[in-house]
């Protein structure tokens, strides 16, 4: 039987919260005896929004806002059943989107 890999993709607006969640997942997986590849930083997506400053006529006066989405990738190679149980019980901070794929 071929061993399965677990690919975890994390997204967040705040990179500090994202890095903390990444280290929590990596420490949990290492503690249960699984091999880890990563964390791999993926490109940050920057969305920019331009709006008029005033409600009336002044088209030349504008303001720009941006939203940055930071991403990280973790590969867990040869996960043990204890690894899967520990990851299911792990409580991560709010604001971190977690996508898990079995490969």
Swiss-Prot record:
One cellular component (GO) term of this entry: ribosome
Pfam families: Ribosomal_S10
Annotated keywords: Ribonucleoprotein, Ribosomal protein
Classification via SUPFAM superfamilies: Ribosomal protein S10
Gene3D superfamilies named among the record's database cross-references: Ribosomal protein S10 domain (3.30.70.600)
Signal peptide annotation: none
InterPro entries, per database record: Ribosomal_uS10 (IPR001848), Ribosomal_uS10_CS (IPR018268), Ribosomal_uS10_dom (IPR027486), Ribosomal_uS10_dom_sf (IPR036838)
UniProt keyword Zinc, yes or no: no
GO biological process, one term: translation
GO molecular function (one): structural constituent of ribosome
Domain of life: Bacteria
PANTHER family: 30S RIBOSOMAL PROTEIN S10 FAMILY MEMBER (PTHR11700)
Family matches, as NCBIfam families: PRK00596.1, rpsJ_bact
Annotated HAMAP family: Ribosomal_uS10
Family: Belongs to the universal ribosomal protein uS10 family.
Subunit structure: Part of the 30S ribosomal subunit.
Its biological purpose: Involved in the binding of tRNA to the ribosomes.
Protein name (database record): Small ribosomal subunit protein uS10
UniProt source species: Sphingopyxis alaskensis (strain DSM 13593 / LMG 18877 / RB2256) (Sphingomonas alaskensis)
Source organism phylogeny: Bacteria, Pseudomonadati, Pseudomonadota, Alphaproteobacteria, Sphingomonadales
